[in-house]
Structure formats: C-alpha cells, structure tokens
C-alpha cells in the first residue's frame, strides 16, 4: 500500500519528465525532427513553381538542412530527384539574375554529400557564375547594380561563396564582396539597420517617396529575412580568417539587434516591420528566416544567449502554431515585393516551408 501511495504521489513528476507539456514540447528534439519531416513531406506532395525557381531554391535550402538534421531518405531522394531528374543540374535561364542562381546552392550541398561526385553536377553552375562575374548586367530602371534588390542577398552571395569554397576559387569570393558592398551602400539604412527592398523604397526627398500609414519608412519583413538568412548561409561558408568576414559579422549583429526590437507579442513579425498595427497577423516566411538567423547566432556564440534566447523561443513556438495537422505551414505572404495583407492561415508557399525547416535545423542544436 505504501509503495502504491508513493507511486501515485510521484506519478505526475515522472510523467512531466517523460512527456513535454505545453509549449515545452516544441523544443523536444524528437518532436522537432518529426515536425520537420512532416512539413517537408507535405511540401514534397504539394509542389509549386518550376523546380529551378527561386521559390524552390529557398525551399530546398531548408530541405537540405532538414536532411542534415533527420537523415530522412525521403527528403534526400526528393532533393536528388529535383536536381538530377527534373533540373538535370541546370540553373534558370537568366544567367544575370540571382533568382536563377539560388537553386545551385542545393546542387553544391548534394555534390558535397555524395560519395560519387560527378563533374556534371556543377558544370552548369560554373558556366553560369563565370558569365555572371565577367559580363555586365543588363541595366534598366531600378536595376542599377547586379544585386539591386535585397532578396538577392539570400539568392546570390551564398551561391558565389559556396561555389568558390567548393572549387577553391577565390575570384568568386572577391566578386561576392564587390556586389554585396554595392547592394549595402544602395539599400541599407544605417539608422534603422534594415534594408529597403529596392530603390523604390529608398527615400530621395521627392514625390516618389513612399511611407507607411503611420508615417514610418517601409521595411519589408521577408525582404530583411532574406538578408539575415543569406548572411547566415554566407558566414557558414566564409573562413574565420577571411579578410572581409568582419564586415558581414558586423552587419549581421546590427540587424539582429534591430530585429528583436520589432518582434511582436505573439512571437512573429509583421509584414511591415515599422508599422505592425497596419498589418495585423504575423507573417511566417520573414519570421522563419529571423528565427533561423537568431538561433544560429546564439549557437555560434555570435549573439548573447541571455539577450536573444527569449525572442528565439517566442518565435519558434509561434511558428509551430502555424503548422496544421497535415504539415502545411500557413500565414505565409504570397510572392511580392513589399508588405501586404493578402494572406491567412490557409496561405502557404514553398519558401515558407524552407524558412521553417532552416529555423528548426538550428533550434534543435541549441538549448532554447
């Protein structure tokens, strides 16, 4: 009887130790892996866009991170099917456009992972990137530099740097430094520590200037998520002693410090970073990239854990609450170039899944 009484007394404690309760379950490693596999498999079963498209470039970036985390054969086979069978290791048709380069990041990841490395896996990437760094960009309107929009900083820099590191060719790293600095000086607001999406959102002091309803500047959540996510993928490749690495680390830390100030109470960021009241409802793709970038920084000791951990935890919990029972991730703003209100719990896109998978791949590594 005494033994039974003690068992009943300590049963709640035993259960609490073995089964995560409430929000704590979102940080359980088994749960994270299961959720990453579920969301990846849902997205595999619901393809969207050309497999060479930038949207899928972001998705497969998350897919490779998910494979590294889970070692799921389904995920790896889907990536190989995309690269080898659907795309035949080719990039998009626009040699000059970073959107058509991003899928090559996954080609390089697969090349590194494969024991049987074949030259054809990276030949088209080599041909395209050589042309990109040696020939002029076909300039028109706001397209005054090669990376003229901030989204390009996810698409282009990791591609050039990853290729340069993979092939041992420093000219691609040097080209990245040049083009990145051009974009930085064109679009980065050194007071707000955020990027304008493109020249249409840079204040010139004339009738073309654009502001939010509250009078603040327009800084798009996903656009800045692209930048921070791209910085992580860039920094993961650059050697510690690379001469220009301090520039990227400084920019990364500046943006992270600003981004956590703009997180909303529910853990997500709004489509417009400086006018959240005009855009009710969190936006998952930008929030996913922010969560990924912040978690990576804490894991790599680039960000102070005590300062950033609360924001990371809130973001990861909120992101998981946007995943339905089937594994579909909702509240993703559709393709665009600025903040919009045109999304809901039923709105999904492949890059939203990619951002979620990237975030999960870092959350599982840390103590959040």
Each predicted region: which residue ranges?
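Inter-helical turn/loop segments and adjacent helix faces that build the functional surface
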Residues: 163-174, 234-246, 297-305
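Oxyanion-binding "anion nests"
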Residues: 226-274
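Alpha-helical scaffold segments in carbohydrate-active enzymes
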Residues: 38, 42, 65, 85, ...
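C-terminal motif of bacterial Sec signal peptides marking the signal peptidase cleavage site
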Residues: 13-16
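Sec-dependent signal peptide recognition
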Residues: 2-9
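Bacterial lipoprotein signal-peptidase II cleavage site
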Residues: 18-22
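Extended ligand-binding groove/face enriched in aromatic
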Residues: 76-77, 88-209, 214-216, 326
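CBM-like carbohydrate-recognition segments
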Residues: 24-57, 64-104, 110-128, 269, ...
């Amino acid at each position: 009887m005494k033994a039974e009484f003690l068992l009943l007394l300590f049963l709640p404690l035993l259960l609490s130790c073995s089964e995560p309760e409430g929000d704590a379950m979102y940080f359980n490693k088994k749960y994270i892996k299961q959720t990453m596999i579920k969301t990846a498999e849902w997205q595999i079963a619901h393809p969207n866009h050309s497999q060479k498209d930038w949207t899928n470039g972001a998705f497969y970036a998350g897919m490779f991170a998910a494979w590294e985390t889970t070692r799921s054969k389904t995920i790896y086979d889907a990536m190989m099917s995309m690269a080898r069978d659907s795309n035949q290791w080719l990039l998009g048709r626009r040699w000059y456009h970073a959107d058509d380069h991003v899928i090559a990041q996954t080609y390089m990841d697969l090349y590194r992972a494969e024991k049987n490395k074949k030259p054809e896996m990276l030949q088209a990437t080599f041909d395209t990137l050589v042309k990109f760094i040696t020939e002029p960009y076909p300039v028109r309107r706001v397209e005054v530099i090669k990376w003229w929009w901030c989204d390009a900083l996810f698409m282009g820099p990791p591609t050039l740097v990853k290729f340069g590191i993979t092939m041992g060719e420093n000219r691609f790293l040097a080209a990245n430094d040049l083009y990145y600095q051009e974009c930085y000086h064109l679009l980065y607001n050194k007071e707000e520590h955020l990027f304008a999406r493109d020249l249409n959102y840079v204040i010139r002091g004339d009738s073309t200037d654009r502001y939010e309803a509250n009078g603040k500047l327009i800084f798009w959540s996903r656009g800045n998520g692209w930048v921070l996510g791209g910085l992580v993928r860039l920094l993961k490749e650059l050697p510690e002693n690379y001469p220009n690495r301090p520039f990227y680390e400084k920019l990364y830390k500046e943006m992270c410090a600003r981004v956590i100030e703009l997180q909303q109470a529910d853990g997500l960021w709004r489509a417009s970073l400086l006018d959240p009241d005009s855009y009710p409802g969190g936006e998952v793709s930008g929030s996913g990239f922010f969560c990924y970038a912040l978690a990576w920084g804490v894991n790599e000791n680039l960000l102070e854990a005590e300062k950033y951990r609360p924001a990371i935890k809130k973001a990861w919990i909120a992101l998981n609450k946007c995943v339905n029972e089937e594994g579909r991730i909702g509240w993703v703003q559709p393709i665009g170039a600025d903040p919009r209100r045109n999304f809901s719990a039923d709105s999904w896109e492949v890059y939203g899944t990619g951002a979620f998978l990237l975030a999960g791949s870092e959350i599982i590594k840390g103590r959040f």
